[in-house]
Amino acid sequence: MYPSNKKKKVWREEKERLLKMTLEERRKEYLRDYIPLNSILSWKEEMKGKGQNDEENTQETSQVKKSLTEKVSLYRGDITLLEVDAIVNAANASLLGGGGVDGCIHRAAGPCLLAECRNLNGCDTGHAKITCGYDLPAKYVIHTVGPIARGHINGSHKEDLANCYKSSLKLVKENNIRSVAFPCISTGIYGFPNEPAAVIALNTIKEWLAKNHHEVDRIIFCVFLEVDFKIYKKKMNEFFSVDDNNEEEEDVEMKEDSDENGPEEKQSVEEMEEQSQDADGVNTVTVPGPASEEAVEDCKDEDFAKDENITKGGEVTDHSVRDQDHPDGQENDSTKNEIKIETESQSSYMETEELSSNQEDAVIVEQPEVIPLTEDQEEKEGEKAPGEDTPRMPGKSEGSSDLENTPGPDAGAQDEAKEQRNGTK
């Protein structure tokens, strides 16, 4: 059945030699024709070629970044001619060849495939094992054992068939296989109904691709019979529609959108914090600090020097009244008044300081601007002074009842002050 020269070769040596060869080197040793991968249209390309306008295709291409339809193909023909990284063999439990597609693959691959399969000690249903492709254009052969249904299927049959595809795809990922072709598993002499088998195959591969689309370039559904071709063509439109985006890609885009909005949300949170800090800053500005205390001390010194009006008990003296009383207060300076006013101002300042420390919003007393008197004004004030019967008390205000009731200096002191002013004049 096989050429005699192939029987004499040791399969291990042949496998090692073939796996080291480049694609061009292997092509020189092909014994049959082959079908390169680039000649097999993807499902997306095939659907575009069926009466769709170029404008629609351009729109779809721009909208669909990564479509699963670019990863799958439907091909009707001989699986042993496909030049892909691996083909899947619907094998029996012994892995020693049989009827249907299993026999075709063994015959095309040569005796070394059978020799290696004997070394694998069979395979359980739903599992898969991998060998070299030998004389096949495919680099590897993945052997999987499907369930025997005999026309009647149950949950166990469906699970076993799905596991055939899952275990085969696991080997694809582990061996860095970029292109693989699947036949119809268990639909031949094993009697699994064609349509349910196609649904399981398409659904299982779609779920795997959604998570591992970057692991492969192409998965080919290779059918031989017309009935299977019609079923797959119909079902692929349902499972792999042209505008069916990669689910994982959509998740990635959602993450990217969230990352883009993240900094903006962070900014807004930071801005809100800054605004709250600013608001807190405005509230704390009114609390008296060292600078305000110094200002109060300066005001105190000015009061001592110029006998200005004083606020008592935390009440603010009316500015207009203080402006009117200010010149007269300067005119009636005397040693006794200065001592008395100094004492009162000190007690008033202490009371004001206590109140300001207890209040949240301190009231900063603004002192009126003091305009020094010129010589002419002093002379006029001096002329006006003798005509006055009683001097006006410095620091007198409408709201200070204590100052109004305070007795003035004795008459002798007043006469003495008048004589001094007249003598000066």
From Swiss-Prot:
Summary of subunit composition and partner proteins: Interacts with ADP-ribosylated PARP1.
Binding sites annotated in the UniProt record for substrate: 77-79, 90-92, 97-102, 185-191, 224
Function: Removes ADP-ribose from aspartate and glutamate residues in proteins bearing a single ADP-ribose moiety. Inactive towards proteins bearing poly-ADP-ribose. Deacetylates O-acetyl-ADP ribose, a signaling molecule generated by the deacetylation of acetylated lysine residues in histones and other proteins.
Composition bias type Acidic residues, residue spans: 244-262
GO molecular function, one term: ADP-ribosylglutamate hydrolase activity
Entry's localization field: Nucleus
Pfam families attached to this UniProt entry: Macro
EC id: 3.5.1.-, 3.2.2.-
Annotated family: Belongs to the MacroD-type family. MacroD1/2-like subfamily.
Activity regulation summary: Subject to product inhibition by ADP-ribose.
Cross-link (Glycyl lysine isopeptide (Lys-Gly) (interchain with G-Cter in ubiquitin)): 170
Residue ranges of domain Macro in the record: 59-240
Protein's name in the database: ADP-ribose glycohydrolase MACROD2
GO cellular component term, pick one: nucleoplasm
SUPFAM superfamilies per UniProt: Macro domain-like (SSF52949)
Catalytic activity: 2''-O-acetyl-ADP-D-ribose + H2O = ADP-D-ribose + acetate + H(+); 4-O-(ADP-D-ribosyl)-L-aspartyl-[protein] + H2O = L-aspartyl-[protein] + ADP-D-ribose + H(+); 5-O-(ADP-D-ribosyl)-L-glutamyl-[protein] + H2O = L-glutamyl-[protein] + ADP-D-ribose + H(+); alpha-NAD(+) + H2O = ADP-D-ribose + nicotinamide + H(+)
Impact after mutating residue 92 to A: Reduced ADP-ribosyl hydrolase activity
Highest taxon above the source species: Eukaryota
PANTHER family: ADP-RIBOSE GLYCOHYDROLASE MACROD2, GANGLIOSIDE INDUCED DIFFERENTIATION ASSOCIATED PROTEIN 2-RELATED
Region annotated Disordered, chain positions: 243-425
GO BP annotations listed: brain development; DNA damage response; peptidyl-glutamate ADP-deribosylation; protein de-ADP-ribosylation; purine nucleoside metabolic process; response to bacterium
Keywords: DNA damage, Hydrolase, Isopeptide bond, Nucleus, Ubl conjugation
